[in-house]
């Protein structure tokens, strides 16, 4: 999965695997992989003006694991 730098708020980079529907986010505090993420959620997160607001509202509740 290719990680794209974003350097916004508490986020450093993110990447998405459309086959596995996994979103990987590198925070300043570590890397988390979120599962079952639809592509449209990733696309909207990528262009969101406030990454923190979008993350808290649309991504945080998905299943996740720390690391890869």
Q: How should these model regions be labeled?
A:
Residues 1-68:
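Acidic/histidine-enriched, beta-strand-rich ligand/metal-binding domains
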């Amino acid at each position: 999965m290719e990680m794209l730098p974003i350097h916004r708020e508490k986020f450093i980079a993110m990447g998405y695997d459309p086959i596995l529907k996994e979103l990987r986010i590198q925070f300043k505090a570590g890397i988390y992989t979120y599962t079952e993420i639809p592509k449209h959620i990733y696309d909207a997160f990528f262009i969101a003006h406030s990454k923190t607001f979008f993350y808290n509202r649309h991504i945080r509740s998905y299943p996740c694991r720390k690391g890869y």
